[in-house]
A protein has these predicted regions:
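Short, low-complexity, Pro/Ser/Thr/Gly-rich segments in the mature regions of secreted, periplasmic
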Residues: 251-262
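Extracytoplasmic/periplasmic mature domains of Sec-exported, cell-envelope-associated bacterial proteins
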Residues: 50-84, 88-89, 209, 245-253
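A small/polar (G/S/T-enriched), proline-flanked helix-loop surface module common
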Residues: 78-218
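N-terminal low-complexity, Pro/Thr-rich disordered segments
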Residues: 10-11, 21-67, 94-99, 105-140
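Hydrophobic alpha-helical segments, especially transmembrane helices
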Residues: 8-9, 222, 259
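A short, solvent-exposed beta-edge/loop patch
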Residues: 190-252
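Sec-dependent bacterial lipoprotein signal peptides
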Residues: 1-23
Length: 263
């Protein structure tokens, strides 16, 4: 008979929300395998931010600006994601229309209609289990690392600001939960909470979504930041958290590294 931890891990792995794991573990890296809840003022700014007049970055410019292996001190950056892990907007459905931006965010897509976009993924380094750890504890230690899918999207005609408004409104409208379906898999989100967002962007929004996998709940996290006419999306998961249900720390250093490249 499987233990509760193993069962939780199996359930979490089958959830559509955790398609991010497949993306983060596949593809090719740039240079190989190198070794307090609360609302933020930045999130609230989205309701009144003036549209940016900045020309949207082209796909080539986004590629140059996107996170690279040399930009991070740990983990692995993947630049070539499998096509099967790049879920199109029209393949994602939510039970509530107001929650559509959150469903798209959860599966590693984007809100609105960008002029261009590029994707990356980042996987944190694996942790070593303590000496004498049980098999289950060793498994949890190996899984205790964040996996992030990064999408850079540039928008014309104030589209970046509008996308932030839509995401912020969806977070409020869908605080009580929603469900979404992607590639035939339905995922239930029990609740959505706005948390403290990273600094350094024109606007930023951070969310913790409580995923309900057949009664076993765990937190998935997302950050979206705007710099001019470009949005950077960072949906993230931690499989150890999915197995245990415990909270985990979003890797804000990835956001900082990406923001540093967006001028």
């Amino acid at each position: 008979m499987r233990s509760p931890v193993v069962r939780r891990t199996a359930l979490a792995a089958s959830a559509a929300a955790l398609a991010l794991f497949a993306t983060a573990c596949g593809g090719s890296s740039d240079e190989g395998d190198k070794g307090a809840d609360g609302r933020t003022a930045q999130a609230d700014k989205s309701a009144s931010a003036a549209p940016a007049t900045t020309k949207p970055l082209s796909a080539a410019e986004l590629e140059k600006a996107a996170l690279a292996q040399t930009d991070v001190k740990s983990g692995k950056v993947v630049t070539k994601l499998p096509a099967t892990d790049d879920i199109a907007q029209d393949k994602v459905k939510t039970d509530k229309a107001a929650c559509a931006p959150l469903g798209l965010l959860q599966v590693g897509s984007y809100a609105g209609k960008p002029a261009a976009s590029v994707k990356r993924s980042w996987t944190g380094d694996a942790k070593k289990p303590e000496a004498g750890a049980s098999a289950e504890d060793s498994m949890i230690a190996a899984l205790d690392r964040a996996k992030v899918v990064l999408t850079l999207a540039s928008y014309a005609d104030g589209g970046a600001e509008q996308a932030m408004k839509d995401l912020t409104k969806a977070a409020a409208d869908c605080a009580g939960g929603f469900s979404f379906t992607a590639d035939g898999e339905t995922t239930k989100v029990a609740k959505v909470a706005v948390t403290a967002a990273p600094q350094g962007a024109d606007e930023a929004l951070a969310l913790t979504s409580t995923v309900d996998a057949e009664g076993d709940k765990f937190p998935a996290k997302s950050v979206v930041v705007r710099k001019g006419a470009t949005l950077a999306y960072f949906p993230a998961v931690n499989m150890a958290s999915a197995a245990s249900g415990k909270d985990w720390a979003f890797p804000t250093e990835i956001v900082d590294a990406q923001l540093a490249k967006l001028k």
